[in-house]
């Protein structure tokens, strides 16, 4: 997974930078939770250098969003209190395939904008890239004061091993993710993998975050207890139908479809709370649900379903293309998403896009 998954880089038509309106909207909606966590931390004595990490930073207009908010809030609050503002050290993390070149090409303009908005006394701000999986250690012990992550933790570290066991694999016939036709063992394997990964994530960050340090994490989730509901699975079902069409036309082998499984899971709030309590290193300060409308990919513009389907196809492709290409090859991508658009446009179902935002405090 670490060597395969990456958002589409650059700034072209299929890039993540140009097809991440939904993620940007979700990030914006999570800001009240982030701002409160930062303000609460300002009630204590801040260190001379505040160190923060953004995990799953990707590339594009969303990359510096949270960092800008955190640093500006701290600086303005220190000015209000008559304190000396700290220096800032920022780590931007993503998998090695991330387009870090685009990120750092945009850095000078971003730093200039921060100084313009906050005044000449702001900073300095030092930024470094940290390629690697957040399911492994990334930073020295007790060095982080803030950790932020958005639209990343729904990705698993791997496909559940029960689905890839060559001796006796579980078969999720005709599907690429959990669905109503999935055997119970397939659904259980996804939950087990999520629990393992999320617990590991908390354990690793507990080693890196200083006592009383904060984490604000936003990721896709669900409000219904049933993990096979349309709320979690509808778009994946559309993709599954599109793949089935390609199999029928001889463009994809049936075995290739049956051996592809998406390393992804949308947890319920109770599943999140249970793992936080079980791991024990963090206090859950807040947990909120963000529900975006079905057509949020349009950026607030009311469009017909066919236009929405085209935008949704681009958004999904920008995120999943690297994995589809690795397993199925380059040639199936255009016909796959052409069929996805047709399937989605012909349907009438509408579901909200649900994310969970949690604010955590490292126990002393």
UniProtKB/Swiss-Prot annotation:
GO terms for molecular function: metal ion binding; S-adenosylmethionine-dependent methyltransferase activity. S-adenosyl-L-homocysteine binds at residues 16, 57, 62, 94-95, 133-134. This is Probable methyltransferase TCM_000168. The record marks 148, 220, 330 as: Involved in substrate discrimination. Signal peptide: none annotated. GO terms for biological process: methylation. Its cofactor is Mg(2+). The keyword Calcium does not apply. The keyword Transferase applies.
């Amino acid at each position: 997974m670490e060597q395969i998954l990456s958002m589409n880089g650059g700034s072209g038509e299929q890039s993540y930078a140009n097809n991440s309106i939904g993620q940007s909207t979700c990030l914006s909606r999570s800001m009240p939770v982030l701002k409160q966590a930062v303000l609460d931390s300002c009630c204590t004595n801040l260190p001379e250098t505040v160190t923060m990490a953004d995990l799953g930073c990707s590339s594009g207009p969303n990359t510096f969003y949270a960092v800008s908010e955190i640093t500006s809030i701290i600086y303005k609050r220190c000015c209000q209190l008559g304190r000396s503002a700290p220096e800032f050290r920022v780590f931007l993390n993503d998998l090695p395939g991330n387009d870090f070149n685009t990120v750092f090409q945009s850095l000078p303009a971003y730093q200039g904008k921060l100084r313009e908005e906050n005044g000449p006394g702001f900073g300095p701000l030092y930024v470094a890239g940290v390629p690697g999986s957040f399911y492994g250690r990334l930073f020295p012990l007790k060095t982080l004061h803030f950790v932020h992550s958005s639209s990343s933790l729904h990705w698993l570290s791997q496909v559940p091993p029960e689905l890839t066991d060559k001796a006796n694999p579980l078969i999720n016939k005709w599907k690429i993710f959990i669905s109503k036709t999935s055997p119970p063992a397939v659904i259980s394997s996804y939950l087990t993998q999520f629990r393992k990964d999320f617990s590991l994530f908390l354990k690793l960050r507990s080693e890196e975050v200083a006592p009383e340090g904060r984490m604000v994490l936003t990721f896709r989730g669900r409000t219904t207890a049933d993990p096979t509901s349309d709320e979690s699975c509808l778009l994946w079902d559309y993709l599954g139908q599109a793949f089935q069409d390609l199999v029928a036309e001889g463009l994809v082998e049936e075995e290739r479809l049956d051996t592809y499984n998406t390393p992804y899971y949308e947890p319920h709030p109770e599943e999140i709370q249970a793992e936080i309590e079980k791991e024990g290193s963090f206090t859950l300060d807040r947990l909120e649900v963000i529900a975006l409308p079905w057509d949020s990919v349009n950026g607030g513009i009311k469009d017909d379903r066919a236009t929405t389907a085209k935008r949704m196809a681009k958004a999904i492709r920008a995120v999943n293309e690297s994995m589809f290409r690795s397993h199925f090859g380059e040639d199936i991508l255009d016909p796959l998403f052409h069929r996805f658009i047709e399937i989605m446009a012909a349907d009438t179902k509408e579901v909200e896009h649900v994310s969970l935002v949690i604010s955590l405090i490292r126990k002393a």
